[in-house]
C-alpha cells in the first residue's frame, strides 16, 4: 500500500537525514569531539534467520518493502553522512545498532503503517497480569536479542567516556532468548500470586526471524559489561511499572490505555 494513514515518508528524510546533517554541521562549527548515533537494526535484516552472531561491521542493506523501508534508507544515509564527517573533519563517531530496547513507559502502543497497535511484549505482559492465556507463535525455540534500557544506557555512557575514534557497535548481550523462555519469564514475573497463565502453542502462526548480535567489539573496545539477563530485566521492568517514577514527565498508564 503506497498511501497509508498517518504515513509521511518526507518526515523520515527531514528528521533523520537533514536532522543528522544539522547536528554534524553544529558539531563541526563548535569543534565538538564526537557524535553518538542510534542505527536501526533493519540494516542487517538480510542476515536474520540464524543463530550465527551478526557482526557489527556487516554489510548494511535496507528492506525494499514495508513501513520500515524509508526509515531504514534514511538511517543508512545518516550513517554515511557521519562517516564522511569522521573522515573529512575527524569527528569521532559511535554508531549504535539497536534491536528493540525494552523499557517501561506507560504508553503500551506503537504505530504500524500509521495505525496504533499494542506492542507485542506489552500485550503479553498485560494478559499475564490478568491471568489470561498466552500464545507462542511458530517455533518456540526461535531466539532473539533482549536488551534492557539500563544496559543500553551503560553503552551510551561508555561511548561518552571513550577516547577511541569509534565505529559501529552492536547493542545486545550476544545471547538469544527463545520464544518459550520469553513467555515463561513473563508468566513467572507478572502473573498474580496463585494464578498462572496457560500457554497455547500455535506452530501454524508466523513468528519473527531469529537473530543474535555479536557484541565482542562493544565489550572489548568500550568495556561494556551486560548486567541484565532476561529475568532480571523483567523484574526491574515490573518495579518501574509499579513505581511510575517518571509519571510527571510521561503520565500514568491510565492516561494511555484504550
Q: How should these model regions be labeled?
A:
Residues 1-15, 46:
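NAD(P)H-binding glycine-rich loop region in Rossmannoid oxidoreductase-like domains
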Residues 19, 23-27, 81-82, 155, ...:
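Hydrophobic positions on the long internal alpha-helix
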Residues 21-70:
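Conserved Rossmann-fold NAD(P)-dependent oxidoreductase catalytic core, especially the SDR/UDP-sugar
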Residues 128-258:
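C-terminal substrate-binding subdomain of Rossmann-fold SDR/epimerase-dehydratase oxidoreductases
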Residues 70, 74-77:
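Active-site helix of classical SDR
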Residues 10, 14-21, 33, 68, ...:
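Conserved internal alpha-helix in NAD(P)-dependent oxidoreductase domains
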Residues 36-40, 97-99, 172:
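Active-site beta-alpha turn of Rossmann-fold NAD(P)-dependent dehydrogenases/reductases
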Amino acid at each position: 500500500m503506497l498511501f497509508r494513514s498517518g504515513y509521511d515518508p518526507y518526515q523520515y528524510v527531514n528528521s533523520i537525514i537533514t536532522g543528522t546533517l544539522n547536528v554534524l554541521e553544529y558539531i563541526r562549527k563548535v569543534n565538538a569531539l564526537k557524535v553518538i548515533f542510534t542505527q536501526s537494526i533493519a540494516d542487517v535484516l538480510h542476515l536474520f534467520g540464524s543463530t550465527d552472531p551478526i557482526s557489527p561491521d556487516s554489510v548494511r542493506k535496507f528492506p525494499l518493502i514495508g513501513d520500515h523501508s524509508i526509515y531504514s534508507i534514511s538511517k543508512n544515509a545518516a550513517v554515511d553522512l557521519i562517516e564522511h564527517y569522521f573522515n573529512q573533519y575527524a569527528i569521532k563517531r559511535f554508531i549504535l545498532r539497536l534491536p528493540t530496547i525494552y523499557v517501561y513507559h506507560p504508553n503500551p502502543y506503537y504505530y504500524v503503517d500509521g495505525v496504533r497497535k499494542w506492542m507485542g511484549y506489552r500485550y503479553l505482559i498485560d494478559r499475564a497480569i490478568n491471568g489470561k492465556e498466552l500464545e507462542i507463535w511458530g517455533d518456540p525455540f526461535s531466539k532473539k536479542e533482549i536488551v534492557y534500557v539500563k544496559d543500553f544506557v551503560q553503552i551510551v555512557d561508555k561511548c561518552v567516556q571513550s577516547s577511541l575514534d569509534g565505529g559501529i557497535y552492536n547493542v545486545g548481550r550476544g545471547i538469544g532468548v527463545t520464544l518459550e523462555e520469553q513467555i515463561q519469564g513473563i508468566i513467572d514475573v507478572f502473573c498474580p500470586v496463585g494464578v498462572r497463565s496457560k500457554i497455547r502453542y500455535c506452530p501454524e502462526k508466523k513468528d519473527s526471524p531469529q537473530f543474535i548480535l555479536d557484541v565482542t567489539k562493544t565489550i572489548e573496545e568500550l568495556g561494556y559489561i551486560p548486567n541484565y539477563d532476561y529475568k532480571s530485566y523483567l523484574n526491574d521492568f515490573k518495579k518501574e511499572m509499579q513505581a511510575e517514577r517518571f509519571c510527571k514527565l510521561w503520565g500514568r498508564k491510565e492516561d494511555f490505555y484504550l
